[in-house]
Swiss-Prot record:
Classification via PANTHER family: 50S RIBOSOMAL PROTEIN L21, LARGE RIBOSOMAL SUBUNIT PROTEIN BL21M
GO cellular component terms, semicolon-separated: cytoplasm; ribonucleoprotein complex; ribosome
Name assigned to this protein: Large ribosomal subunit protein bL21
Top-level taxonomic group: Bacteria
Oligomer status and interactors: Part of the 50S ribosomal subunit. Contacts protein L20.
Key word Ribonucleoprotein present: yes
Family indicated by similarity: Belongs to the bacterial ribosomal protein bL21 family.
Transmembrane segments: none
Function: This protein binds to 23S rRNA in the presence of protein L20.
PROSITE patterns: RIBOSOMAL_L21
SUPFAM superfamilies in the cross-refs: L21p-like (SSF141091)
Species per Swiss-Prot/TrEMBL record: Clostridium botulinum (strain Hall / ATCC 3502 / NCTC 13319 / Type A)
Length: 104
């Protein structure tokens, strides 16, 4: 069984046991989160349920494995011949989750 869920403005195709890096969720490590924005559910018998826009009554339960930050992205701006240089870094926060159960 698989599902397509929306979290953090992005869509992910997930199955039970998958490990994902998603945009930061406000949850503690080793807690469970429910993702209820399910767009599509594919069952083992080949049946596919498509939501309009969400599948009613469908939930995906996931366990939070870690909270962290991605690698640093360096933004460097400059203007030639004007002695203007600006260096800025950014590390995007993420949440590492493992899909435990898909309820449809």
């Amino acid at each position: 069984m698989y599902a397509v869920v929306v979290t953090g403005g992005k869509q992910y195709k997930v199955a039970e046991g998958d490990i994902l890096f998603v945009e930061k969720l406000t949850a503690d490590v080793d807690s469970t989160v429910e993702l209820d924005n399910v767009l599509l559910v594919g069952k083992d018998n080949g049946e596919t349920v498509v939501g309009k826009p969400m599948v009613e009554g469908a939930k995906v339960t996931a366990k939070v494995l870690a909270q962290g930050k991605a690698k640093k992205v360096v933004v460097f701006k400059y203007k030639p011949k004007k002695d203007y240089r600006k260096k800025q870094g950014h590390r995007q926060p993420y949440t590492k989750i493992q899909i435990e159960k898909i309820n449809a």
